[in-house]
């Protein structure tokens, strides 16, 4: 049964006792049968090794079954549990989450009894699910908030303590406690992962082959890597835990009295009093603001540095149903945010709660992990384990390699079994080693490093990611969608002027020349609020108020400039109907006192989309449509204004009237024309994205004509093709495409069914869809929409839900989508896109960062000079807690500076200054740790800067990660295939490597494996796009053909080695390793082939640094290659003795070097040739 966005399915189970686990009877019977066969049919003494091998095989299979129970929840449930139809008699439930929301878990079903009623519940990812008898399904018990506003306005909280207990019992308290597991617990969890278990199994096999050094070296490397990851995971979890709210006391209304309780004791339904508190005091949970407006810093949740204004619902229509989706932005204070300013509520209306301390009155609607902050914490917390590559592709690729390994192992077993004297135990061991060789120990480490390197690189660029598994998707992106306002254009809007009725000479560009009515609308119709010395609110409204020169005071009064004409008085705002994306307008009821009278004249001021206000005017200007259409075609944002004087009324009566009563019989007050300049680098970045083979589209809530103008400027649409707009017709029936200039009119769908003619229709026009047209196509012409949507470059007048639907439609067509928005209106689209990037509005961050860096450098320089003068460093160099900046100062310390005698009094001032500098630098280093505000609830990727250059960075890193993964698979596959041959055919010739040789080989190639994942992307995106997956003609062909070349080289060189090997002693596989010409030849050429594989298959440009630019990788290949050449040429005799090698004959040595050179050249030609023909080269 589907439950919610987090949980897909819940299946009830009962745990079986160990004796009744389904795997116990089969293995008991198999073990008994094998014992009988071995002892009574084969014979104990004659087939001792065979008997032990049988037991070993049974034990390994049993261990695998148990591990599969641990790894795979369906297997565990099938073998260890019995399914229950009735959840009420179940002991556990198997919880399967929705895609990308964690992993399945078998959780205990809890039972809590109260008042003779039993509550069935369980906890999954810190969310409580309770069994509901009526609906017969598990539900997250949250407060039902879909109630009329009057319910909340008249609420007085819990009047009886019993009701508090009931709410706590049903809905839970406000705890957001996170328990960080112990190191050992987390290490065991990682140590039972499939790859780790497999690697430990391989280490055991190598030990049986008497390769102790190599086995222990590999095991140490694996355990160190896993321990490092566990430590990092624990650190991350500790930081997440610290992000939770710190406890403090809060005023709550219970039993008709105000009392102080801890924030953890709050329950949904409480009434609280909250205001600006201490620095560390965050809002404890999600609150509905009942009385008293406030300004909130939401940067901890959204990352936005601009404070948000929150309005109380005390003046909202009583019958309006509260919708948490649409009303939360204006009326809900989210948990984890901070109130930076609040206004004491006014006189309480009848039935409303009075504030005990002048703070805001709020209603608790969500607590604990059900809050927005709780959801973000869970996203980060349960996203820790997601830093992996495509597991399905990895598994399939290993299966592909396993085919070769099985063939090699079968060859060895058949050939080896011919000789009856050979040990079957040794033969079986060698066959097992061949099968395991196709999964290199480096694979999981490499895949983790590739993703983690990209994470770190993005962090340095100010881009933070909560879902690392999405990084490779960025390399596969087909279409990039952008919001317009605030994303492509700046927030620094410019008011061009006001166009009035029949204004033939253009628009009024000076506010002083405006009619009084137009000024009144501009000055009063806004949601701005004064915060300290700044205005907080919509950038468009700030631009309008600034342009007309009026000044907003703290009491919602707007005062004219001192230079204003006589007779113009200030305006007091009494009631606001805030702007919403759905209604596309804002209405304000305000009042002013005419000169010489104390009576208040009330006015209604309305501002919004011209097409929405069109039917609200008492007298519509004749050129209304023509004027706003002409202005929007020029790329300007146009808002219509209307005003109406109200008759005599009282302030109290205003609140009782509905919005519709005010929005009619308006007088036209003009069109305010606003230009939205493009960001300085938007054109350059869009060109780079388009030049890198991506389709681009704009999804905006703005006017279609304005959006089409911007799309033409940015070359989303071609100037040579007409842009057709589909908008709602006047009759609502005849849907027609109309060109922006009005010269072309075409039917909705091309009448022809001929594919070529339809293709010509789509290719000869550019398309723009409006929100109403999109709604029509979704519900009436969905087949045509799927055909059309990939050709639409502009989506205008789109509501947030429609933006989300567009992304889902594109994904359903198999397109990998990227959405870039501002993180507020675009949350749904950002979440549903394969790659969602939220740009935060922090225009001064870059400058501040540069200033801080400058200050830091100055401090380091001052510290260095103090050290040179003899001041003593407060911490030893290289200490675990020492910041890099402190270490920079230490580098210039004179010898013995740390261990000097106590300083003379005259040096105390310098010493104190140095100590302070070091403390400041250390604090700065600590401040760079990621905080909750760095991540956003809006999107998987959050950029701290407003530039869409972030999109290019994300795509570059995505491509780099994809290509790195692909080249790693190629290299590891080739090495595994060569290894499989060496272990099979050559094993029968007596070829084996010593423990020392295997260890040295591992050490030499370890650096290559490390630096291959550290590749950095290029500074610009390439036109070519990387292949999206491992399984393609290029990869399979290049691996196969390169292996054939390697195989041929091995055969040729081994043949020469056999001829050069004068010692023709019979092969003794049990004998202790002794170096000879054959062993030495195979060891050197196998190492040489592996180095060649790295050199040939390193991808480099156009997606990442070339081999010559990646110095670390180049030097590691050169060092390994140099070591191989030295050994092959026989120049370092002592080194060869140390490596247990013999000096090769000159003819064999020369042949070997020539063969390796030929292998390198031929493999390079094969790889680049196939890439040119089948790959992503051109």
UniProtKB/Swiss-Prot annotation:
| Record region (Disordered) | 868-904
Q: Cite the record's Low complexity compositional bias ranges.
A: 870-904
What's the catalysed reaction? ATP + H2O = ADP + phosphate + H(+)
List S-S links within the chain: none
- A Pfam family that this protein carries is 2TM_P5A-ATPase
Biological role stated in the UniProt entry? Mediates manganese transport into the endoplasmic reticulum. The ATPase activity is required for cellular manganese homeostasis.
> What is the name of the protein in this document?
Probable manganese-transporting ATPase catp-8
């Amino acid at each position: 049964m589907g439950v919610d966005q987090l949980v897909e399915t819940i299946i009830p189970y009962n745990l079986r006792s160990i004796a009744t686990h389904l795997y116990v009877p089969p293995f008991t019977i198999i073990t008994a049968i094998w014992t009988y066969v071995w002892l009574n049919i084969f014979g104990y003494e004659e087939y001792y090794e065979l008997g032990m091998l049988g037991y070993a095989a049974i034990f390994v299979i049993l261990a695998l079954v148990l591990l599969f129970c641990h790894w795979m929840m369906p297997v565990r449930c099938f073998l260890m549990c019995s399914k229950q139809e009735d959840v009420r008699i179940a002991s556990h439930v198997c919880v399967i989450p929705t895609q990308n929301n964690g992993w399945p878990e078998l959780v205990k079903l809890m039972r809590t009894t109260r008042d003779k009623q039993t509550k069935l519940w369980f906890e999954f990812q810190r969310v409580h699910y309770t069994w509901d008898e009526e609906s017969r399904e598990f539900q997250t018990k949250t407060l039902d908030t879909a109630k009329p506003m009057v319910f909340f306005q008249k609420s007085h909280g819990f009047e009886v303590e019993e009701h508090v207990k009931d709410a706590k019992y049903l809905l839970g308290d406000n705890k957001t406690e996170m328990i960080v597991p112990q190191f050992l617990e987390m290490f065991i969890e990682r140590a039972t992962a499939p790859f780790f278990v497999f690697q430990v199994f391989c280490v055991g096999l190598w030990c049986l082959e008497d390769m102790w050094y190599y086995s222990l070296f590999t095991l140490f490397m694996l355990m160190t890597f896993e321990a490092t990851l566990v430590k990092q995971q624990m650190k991350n979890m500790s930081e997440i835990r610290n992000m939770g709210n710190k406890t403090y006391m809060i005023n709550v209304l219970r039993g008709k009295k105000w009392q102080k309780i801890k924030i953890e004791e709050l329950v949904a339904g409480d009434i609280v009093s909250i205001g600006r508190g201490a620095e560390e005091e965050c809002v404890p949970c999600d609150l509905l603001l009942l009385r008293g407006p406030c300004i909130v810093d939401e940067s901890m949740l959204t990352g936005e540095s601009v404070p948000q204004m929150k309005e109380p619902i005390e003046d909202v229509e009583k019958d309006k149903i509260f919708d948490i989706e649409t009303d939360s932005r204006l009326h809900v204070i989210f948990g984890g945010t901070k109130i930076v300013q609040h206004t004491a509520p006014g006189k309480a209306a009848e039935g409303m709660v009075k504030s005990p301390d002048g703070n805001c009155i709020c209603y608790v609607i969500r607590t604990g992990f059900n809050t927005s902050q709780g959801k973000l914490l869970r996203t980060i917390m349960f996203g820790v384990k997601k830093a992996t590559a495509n597991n399905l592709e990895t598994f399939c690729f290993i299966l592909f390699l396993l085919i070769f390994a099985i063939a090699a192992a079968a060859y060895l077993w058949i050939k080896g079994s011919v000789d009856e004297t050979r040990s079957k135990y040794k033969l079986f061991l060698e066959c097992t080693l061949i099968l395991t060789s196709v999964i290199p120990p480096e694979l999981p480490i490499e895949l983790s490093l590739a993703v983690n390197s990209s994470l770190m690189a993005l962090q340095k660029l100010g881009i933070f990611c909560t879902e690392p598994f999405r990084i490779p998707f960025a390399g596969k992106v087909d279409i990039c969608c952008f919001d317009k306002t605030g994303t492509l254009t700046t927030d620094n809007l410019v008011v061009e002027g006001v166009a009035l009725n029949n204004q033939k000479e253009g628009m009024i560009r000076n506010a002083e020349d405006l009619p009084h009515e137009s000024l009144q609308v501009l000055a009063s119709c806004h949601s701005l609020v004064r915060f300290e010395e700044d205005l907080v609110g919509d950038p468009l409204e700030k631009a309008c108020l600034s342009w007309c020169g009026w000044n907003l005071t703290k009491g919602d009064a707007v005062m004219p400039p001192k230079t204003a004409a006589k007779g113009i008085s200030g305006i007091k705002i009494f009631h606001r109907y805030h702007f919403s994306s759905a209604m596309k307008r804002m209405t304000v009821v305000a009042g002013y006192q005419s000169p010489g009278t104390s009576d208040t004249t009330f006015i209604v001021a309305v501002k919004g989309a011209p097409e929405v206000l069109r039917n609200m005017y008492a007298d519509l200007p004749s050129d209304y449509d023509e004027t706003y259409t002409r202005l929007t075609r020029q790329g300007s944002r146009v808002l219509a204004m209307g005003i109406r004087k109200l008759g005599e009324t009282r302030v109290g009566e205003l609140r009782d009237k509905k919005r519709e009563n005010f929005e009619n019989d308006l007088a036209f007050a003009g069109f305010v024309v606003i230009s939205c300049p493009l960001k300085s680098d938007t054109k350059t970045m869009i060109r780079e994205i388009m030049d890198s083979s991506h389709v681009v589209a704009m999804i905006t809530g703005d006017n279609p004509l304005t959006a089409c103008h911007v799309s033409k400027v940015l070359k989303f649409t071609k100037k040579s093709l007409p842009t057709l707009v589909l908008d709602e017709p006047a009759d609502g029936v005849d849907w027609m495409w109309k060109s922006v200039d009005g010269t072309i009119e075409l039917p909705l769908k091309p009448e022809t069914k001929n594919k070529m003619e339809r293709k010509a229709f789509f290719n000869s026009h550019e398309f723009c869809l409006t929100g109403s047209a999109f709604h029509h196509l979704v519900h009436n012409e969905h087949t045509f929409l799927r055909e059309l949507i990939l050709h639409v470059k502009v989506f205008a007048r789109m509501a947030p839900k429609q933006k989300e639907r567009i992304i889902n439609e594109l994904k359903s067509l198999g397109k990998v989508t990227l959405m870039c928005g501002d993180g507020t209106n675009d949350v749904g689209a950002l979440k549903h896109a394969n790659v969602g990037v939220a740009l935060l509005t922090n225009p001064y961050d870059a400058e501040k960062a540069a200033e801080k860096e400058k200050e830091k450098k100055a401090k380091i320089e001052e510290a260095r000079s103090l050290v040179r003068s003899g001041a003593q460093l407060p911490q030893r160099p290289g200490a675990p807690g020492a910041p890099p900046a402190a270490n920079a100062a230490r580098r210039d310390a004179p010898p013995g500076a740390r261990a000097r005698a106590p300083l003379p009094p005259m040096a105390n001032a310098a010493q104190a200054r140095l100590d302070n500098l070091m403390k400041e630098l250390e604090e700065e280093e600590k401040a760079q740790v990621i905080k909750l505000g760095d991540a956003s609830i809006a999107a998987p990727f959050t950029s701290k800067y407003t530039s869409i250059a972030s999109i290019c960075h994300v795509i570059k890193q995505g491509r780099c990660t994809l290509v790195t993964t692909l080249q790693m698979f190629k290299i590891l596959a080739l090495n595994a295939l060569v290894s499989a041959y060496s272990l099979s055919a050559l094993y029968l010739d007596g070829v084996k490597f010593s423990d020392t040789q295997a260890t040295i080989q591992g050490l030499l190639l370890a650096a290559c494996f490390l630096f291959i994942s550290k590749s950095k992307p290029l500074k610009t995106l390439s036109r070519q796009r990387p292949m999206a997956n491992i399984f393609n003609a290029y990869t399979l062909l290049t691996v196969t053909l390169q292996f054939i070349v390697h195989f041929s080289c091995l055969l040729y060189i081994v043949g020469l080695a056999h001829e050069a090997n004068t010692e023709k002693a019979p092969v003794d596989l049990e004998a202790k390793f002794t170096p000879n010409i054959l062993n030495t030849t195979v060891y050197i050429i196998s190492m040489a082939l592996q180095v060649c594989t790295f050199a040939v298959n390193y991808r480099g440009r156009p997606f990442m640094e070339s081999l010559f630019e990646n110095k670390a990788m180049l030097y590691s290949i050169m060092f390994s290659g140099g070591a191989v050449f030295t050994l092959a040429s026989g120049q370092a005799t002592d080194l060869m003795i140390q490596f247990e090698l013999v000096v090769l004959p000159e003819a064999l040595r020369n042949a070997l070097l020539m063969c390796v050179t030929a292998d390198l050249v031929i493999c390079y030609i094969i790889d680049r040739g196939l890439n040119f023909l089948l790959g992503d080269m051109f």
